[in-house]
């Protein structure tokens, strides 16, 4: 990766989570819904799965548009993030980008964004995320 990946979550409101994601050539800004799934829960679990050499997927549902982040491990410190989109959950996916990088380049920014999200003070009716800062800190800073 030539440019660093950045991802940030903003304060959720009424079941919508504003997300900013940038990793060349992809630059996304969207609000994900919590109606069908909790994408932050999926992100946390995907990272845990990667640490155990398994794949993971995050579905960002925009009602009806959808982004998919598919994670896989490609080596001891190699990771791949495949980003695709679809007009709705059940439609065929169109690939947007395949990003290859190290833990520091691809996974650490996701961990950081989850930690920052844990610092928000909001009513749980606005978003169902149930992990604490201590839970997220179990994800290593580096491999």
Predicted regions and their residues:
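Short acidic, glycine-rich loop/turn motifs
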Residues: 21-25, 60-62, 85-87
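A short, compositionally biased
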Residues: 12-17, 52-55, 75-77
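Mid-chain, well-packed structural core segment of small domains
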Residues: 71-99
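Broad, structure-driven detector of short, well-ordered beta-strand segments within folded domains
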Residues: 5-9, 65-73
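Mixed-charge, glycine-accented linear interaction segment located at domain edges/termini
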Residues: 90-143
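N-terminal "first-domain core" detector
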Residues: 1-37
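Short, surface-exposed linear segments at secondary-structure transitions and domain or protein termini
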Residues: 37-45, 78-80, 104-109
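Short, well-structured hydrophobic secondary-structure segments
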Residues: 32-68
């Amino acid at each position: 990766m030539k440019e660093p990946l950045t991802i940030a979550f903003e304060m959720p409101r009424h079941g919508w989570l504003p997300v900013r994601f940038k990793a060349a050539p992809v630059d996304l800004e969207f609000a994900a819904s919590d109606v069908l799934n909790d994408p932050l829960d999926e992100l946390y679990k995907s990272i845990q799965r990667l640490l155990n050499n398994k794949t993971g997927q995050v579905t960002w549902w925009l009602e009806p548009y959808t982004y998919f982040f598919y994670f896989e491990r490609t080596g001891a410190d190699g990771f791949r993030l495949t980003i695709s989109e679809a007009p709705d959950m059940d439609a065929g996916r169109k690939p947007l980008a395949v990003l290859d990088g190290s833990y520091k380049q691809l996974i650490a920014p996701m961990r950081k964004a989850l930690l920052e999200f844990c610092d928000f003070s909001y009513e749980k009716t606005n978003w169902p995320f149930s992990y604490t800062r201590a839970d997220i800190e179990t994800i290593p800073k580096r491999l």
